[in-house]
Structure formats: structure tokens, C-alpha cells
Amino acid sequence: MRRRSLETALTGATGRIGGRVAARLATKGVPLRLLVRDPDRAPDLPGATPVVAPFADGDAVRAALAGVETAFMVSASEAADRAQQHVTFVEAAAAAGVRHLVYLSFQGASRESTFTFARDHAVTEEAIRASGMAWTFLRDSFYADFMPGLVGDDGIIRGPGGDGRVAVVAQDDIADAAAAVLLDPAAHAGRTYTLTGPAALSFNEIAAIVGEASGRDVCYVDETLDEARASRAGYGAPDWEVAGWISTYTAVAAGEHAEVTGDVEALTGHPATPLREVLAPAG
């Protein structure tokens, strides 16, 4: 009989979400197995053991997850083959004997999502459902913390978002929700949660809040698709990546991310954090 471990396994511990979740679980005394590509970058947390296991290396993932009952899967970095990387990871997790996989997905994940990167999440969810493992899906909205990054050097947010609205969510709220699920995974088996902020905002409203927080003049300029492609051509990014960036805006314009839910509060016991509060200077 395979020996079971009390450890919870996490991917993405060197990133913004996985690192936050790992820290929260460590403070609760949960022993952790951190699946990373570079162990030197793994957070130094009590009870945490880093293990090298890239998503695409099924053998390494299977070995890293041996004996683990519960794992938290944060998606790999955006790549042309990300969906296949995810499927490889899921199959390896199931083969390793993982019983419950908690996956950080994306709001409205579907193979038909306008936001092209969300399609990878749909493929991943399908693989998890078919794996035989128990599962919980945490579908988050766009990160509130990233809104300042949409602003160009000229103080303009550009994109074909029209009058669409998006309920951006704080990374700390996502981490709180994920930690709550991982502390009692059985209570959330077979559940899908949509994690949003407390209000659906237009890009004009987002620009105003970012400007207020940064002390600079920020505005939003609605682009056509041709204008959006032209304004991003200088980055030298591959076509699939540029399409993903642009579809961030077209998905909002299509109304696919305007939903506001109470799932953050239901899981964490506290209300979702408004964008203005997320961007407020510390102290």
C-alpha cells in the first residue's frame, strides 16, 4: 500500500498567487511540498520542501507528487503549448495517486472564450474532470493588482474594450480563498467558484482609480482591432501572445467578465477588496 503524506503540494510557489497561498498555509502549520523549476527561488517557509518538477515533465511531476493527497495547481506561464503542459501535469498527478486537485482556473473558462488564454483553462478543467481525481475549480477574474500595468508610458490604457465592464479581483483575495479550500478540501469537492472583485468597472473607471492611486493623469482610449494590433506590433511578441493580450479587452467588451459573485466572501469570510483599496499605498 502506498504511504500517504500529510503534505499539501503546490505549484507556482515562486509566483504571486502560489507564493501567497504557500505562506498562508505555512502559518497554519500545513507541511508543504513546493513543485518548482528552480529550487533556489522557492520561498523559505517552515515545513516546506521544494521539489523540481516542471509541468511538461510527467515523470518528474509523478515522482514529486508521490504520496500526496491534495495538490494546488496554479497554471503554467502563458505559452503556445500551455494546454498540453497542463494535461501532462494532470495525468501525472492522477498517476501519482493524488486524490484531490484544486485548480486555479479562469472566469468563464470555455473552449469558446473570447479571451484566448482562458481556452487553456477549459482544456485543463476537462482533463481534471476525466482524471478520476476529486476536484475544485477556482475561476478568478483579471487581477486587480495588474491594472497599473495596463498604463502606457504616456498615461493611457489602450485596448478594444469598448464600454465593457470587468470585476477585477485582488490577488490577496484569491490566495485567501484558495487557502480556505486547501485547509478543508473535502468540503469543496466538485465545486466551481468564481472569484471576482466587488464591482464591475469600465476601463474609464479603472483608469481613474489607477490615476488616483498613482498621482498621475491616466485615461482610457478605446481602440479598433487594427489599432490594437498596430499599437502592440513593436513588442516583437508572437502572434498567439498578441492575440491573447488584445482578447483581454475584447472579452470585456463582449460582457464575459462583468459578473460579480459573492464567492470570495463565502470562502474567506471577508468581502472582496475594491480596486481602490488594492492600489492604495501601504501604510
Residue ranges of predicted features:
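Conserved SAM-binding strand-loop segment of SAM-dependent methyltransferases
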Residues: 49-52
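Short hotspots in intrinsically disordered terminal tails
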Residues: 1-2, 280
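Residues lining the SAM
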Residues: 11, 74, 269
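A hydrophobic C-terminal alpha-helical subdomain
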Residues: 226-283
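Oxidoreductase cofactor-interface core, primarily capturing Rossmann-like NAD(P)-dependent enzymes
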Residues: 2-45, 56-69, 77-87, 91-100, ...
